[in-house]
């Protein structure tokens, strides 16, 4: 009977108590993270996360511009997580979040948060790290300015008041400790919630101690040899267990009733607060696979284990392959691999220099893609280029040569007839595994043709062969036909040669721009815009419309066109000025004529009154004898001397 009294119930009755204890422990862990997340960060750490569950994900503490931030989305996640472990199930998530965001409006910008513009760099960083659901303009809160417990208490108070009023709440109690919580409107819900959480913790601690005492009693019973000893031992253990439970129930709390439950739920002595200086408390590290932090949060510079951490460096290369090479890649390849034998240090014999490793390279490959050739190929003469070793499109390699001797790439072994270079095989093309020509340069120079009219597209102007015009030198030449026809306008990804030294010689060995019977290919040329059709110096439209046939104009023709255009514009200006002067002079000329008539009448009258005599003929008579002359053109009117003289006389008379 003593065993039954000591056990005090069946094992199934302790399962809900264990779940409540686990829920309270998870709430304590989250509160501890919210209180100590900005402490003990690594050197390059920018974010620290706490995993909630599969539905809510992570809560992140972000370090940005020397400050620690938390988003409103993460605040809602924390409150939802606490409600679930408190025993209340969320039935209307949208209304629940609206109430929390309404409370967050009390946290003002500047004092408790910052206002970020839409799609800013900070919001983009938060969005990529799943701290936000959108990049709209919003507030991001300072880490220590968010009252998490007060926000949870306000959300719970809204639901409890709705339940009393008969309205539909956003959450519903479905298990402990929410089922045993009774709301008293006369006191603060914040204080009531703290008391209730502390009471639940004491009850679970008592149940845990009772379970441990029962297990000890059962063990002692199996070891003892007599039933009396077992019964007496069980009675003593039962008495001890009862005494411990009474002490646990009457033990006073270290925190006050008005303090936050974040600090009152865990009762610790003053000597037990050394964990605040540690990265992780020792009680959480014991008997668990606890890691230092989330692996994506920072760069671990002490170890080279790339499986544990993901670096923020864009140029980082994981694996042992990248770590064994220096930053400048000097230790990856031998530097003497790319040095010709003639420039290397002689070792006493020419054979040693000849057998050094050769490198195949050309313009199509980077230096990192160059590969050494293990077996040097024998020299190939230029007479065998039309054989089977060369592709058909490679015939132009040897038909175009440069006048500078090809000293850009191989100055050592081509012009030096020494014994060291006597047996050296020239580098070969990595694309065709064939040799370069002796005087070849791999710099392309494009040859552009002068477009002709459609009727003379085959033979050029006047039955002459097709002309080609080099824009670099300004020379025209006539190409010769060779067996290999090649399209110069659309070259393949192969070599071209430089024809700066000998334009005519190069063009003579080049394939034509297009066949005589083929369709002409238009070439991009600069357009000449003419506003007036009379000023076009030559016919510029083609009959067939396939291409524009224009000969490159000479400098004298361009100067003549410019002079004609300038003369035409000046003539228009003179006409406009002359018309304006005539309009202004019409009213003034009528006034001067009237004044002249009055003046002449007064003179004649005064002479007749004086008794007559010989008088001088007045100049006014000339005005009556004027003859209006008609000029043939506007230039005659402008350059007329008669008009200028008459105007001068009228001005003098008007002044007198």
Curated annotation (Swiss-Prot):
- Keyword Nucleus listed: yes
Q: Which GO terms describe its molecular function?
A: DNA binding; DNA-binding transcription factor activity
| Record's subcellular location | Nucleus
Q: Which domain of life is it from?
A: Eukaryota
What are the boundaries of the region Disordered?
205-289, 575-656
- Keyword set, alphabetical order: Activator, DNA-binding, Nucleus, Transcription, Transcription regulation
Q: Which GO terms describe its biological process?
A: cellular response to nutrient; cellular response to starvation; development of symbiont in host; filamentous growth; filamentous growth of a population of unicellular organisms; filamentous growth of a population of unicellular organisms in response to biotic stimulus; filamentous growth of a population of unicellular organisms in response to starvation; fungal-type cell wall organization
One Pfam match, by short name? STE
Q: According to its record, what are the GO cellular component terms?
A: nucleus; Ste12p-Dig1p-Dig2p complex; Tec1p-Ste12p-Dig1p complex
Chief place where the protein resides: nucleus
Question: Which residues form the DNA-binding region?
Answer: 44-154
**Bias (Basic and acidic residues):** 646-656
Q: Where is the composition biased (Low complexity)?
A: 205-242, 575-586, 600-609
Keyword Chloroplast (UniProt): no
Q: Where is the composition biased (Polar residues)?
A: 243-267, 628-642
Give the family from UniProt. Answer: Belongs to the STE12 transcription factor family.
What does the protein in this record do?
A: Transcription factor involved in the formation of pseudohyphae and hyphae. It is likely to play a role in the developmental switch between yeast and mycelial forms. May be involved in a signal transduction system, strengthening the possibility of a sexual phase up to now undetected, and similar to that of the yeast mating pathway.
Task: Please report the name of this protein according to its UniProt entry.
Answer: Transcription factor CPH1
Q: Which organism is it from?
A: Candida albicans (strain SC5314 / ATCC MYA-2876)
The gene that this protein is the product of is: CPH1
């Amino acid at each position: 009977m003593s065993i039954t009294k000591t056990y005090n119930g069946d094992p199934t009755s302790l399962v809900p108590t264990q779940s409540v204890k686990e829920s309270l422990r998870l709430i304590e862990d989250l509160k501890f993270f919210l209180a100590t997340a900005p402490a003990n960060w690594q050197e390059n750490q920018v974010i620290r996360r706490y995993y909630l569950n599969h539905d809510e994900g992570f809560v992140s503490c972000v370090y940005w511009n020397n400050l620690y931030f938390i988003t409103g989305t993460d605040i809602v996640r924390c409150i939802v997580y606490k409600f679930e472990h408190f025993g209340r199930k969320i039935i209307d998530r949208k209304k629940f979040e609206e109430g929390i965001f309404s409370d967050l409006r009390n946290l003002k910008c500047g004092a408790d948060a910052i206002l970020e513009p839409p799609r800013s760099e900070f919001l983009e960083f938060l969005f990529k790290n799943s701290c936000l659901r959108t990049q709209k303009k919003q507030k991001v809160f300072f880490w220590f300015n968010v009252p998490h417990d007060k926000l949870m208490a306000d959300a719970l108070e809204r639901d409890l008041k709705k339940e009393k009023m008969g309205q539909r709440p956003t959450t519903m109690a479905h298990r402990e400790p929410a089922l045993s919580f009774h709301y008293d409107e006369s006191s603060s819900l914040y204080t009531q919630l703290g008391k209730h959480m502390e009471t639940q913790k004491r009850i679970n601690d008592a149940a845990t101690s009772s379970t441990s005492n029962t297990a000890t009693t059962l063990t002692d019973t199996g070891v003892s040899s007599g039933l009396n000893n077992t019964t007496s031992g069980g009675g003593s253990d039962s008495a001890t267990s009862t005494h411990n439970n009474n002490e646990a129930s009457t033990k006073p709390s270290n925190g006050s009733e008005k303090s936050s439950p974040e600090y009152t739920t865990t009762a610790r002595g003053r000597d037990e607060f050394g964990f605040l200086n540690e990265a992780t408390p020792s009680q959480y590290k014991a008997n668990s696979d606890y890691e230092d932090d989330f692996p994506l949060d920072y760069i671990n510079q002490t170890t080279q284990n790339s499986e544990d951490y993901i670096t923020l460096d864009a140029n980082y290369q994981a694996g042992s392959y990248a770590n064994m090479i220096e930053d400048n890649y000097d230790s990856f390849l031998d530097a003497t691999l790319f040095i010709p034998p003639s420039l290397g240090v002689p070792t006493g014999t020419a054979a040693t220099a000849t057998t050094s490793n050769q490198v195949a390279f050309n313009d199509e490959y980077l230096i990192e893609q160059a590969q050494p050739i293990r077996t040097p190929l024998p020299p190939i003469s230029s007479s065998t280029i039309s054989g089977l070793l060369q592709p058909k499109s490679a015939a132009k390699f040897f038909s175009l040569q440069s006048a500078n001797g090809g000293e850009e790439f191989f100055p050592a072994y081509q012009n030096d007839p020494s014994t060291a270079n006597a047996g050296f095989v020239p580098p070969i093309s990595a694309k065709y595994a064939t040799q370069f020509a002796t005087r070849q340069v791999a710099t392309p120079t494009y040859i552009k043709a002068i477009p002709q009219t459609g009727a003379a597209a085959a033979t050029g102007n006047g039955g002459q062969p097709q002309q080609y015009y080099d824009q670099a030198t300004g020379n025209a030449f006539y190409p010769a036909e060779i067996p290999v026809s090649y399209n110069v306008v659309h070259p393949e990804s192969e070599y071209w040669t430089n024809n700066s030294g000998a334009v005519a010689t190069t063009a003579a060995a080049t394939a034509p721009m297009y066949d005589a019977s083929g369709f002409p290919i238009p070439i991009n040329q600069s357009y000449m815009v003419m506003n007036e059709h009379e000023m076009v110096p030559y016919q510029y439209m083609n009959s067939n419309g396939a291409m524009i046939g224009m000969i490159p104009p000479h400098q004298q023709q361009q100067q003549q066109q410019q002079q004609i255009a300038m003369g035409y514009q000046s003539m228009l200006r003179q006409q406009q000025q002359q018309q304006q002067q005539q309009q202004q002079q019409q009213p003034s000329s009528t006034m001067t004529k009237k004044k002249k008539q009055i003046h002449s009448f007064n003179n004649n009258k005064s002479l007749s009154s004086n008794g007559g005599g010989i008088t001088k003929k007045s100049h006014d008579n000339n005005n009556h004898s004027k003859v209006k002359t008609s000029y043939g053109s506007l230039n005659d009117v402008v350059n007329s001397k008669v008009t200028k003289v008459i105007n001068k006389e009228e001005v003098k008379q008007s002044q007198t």
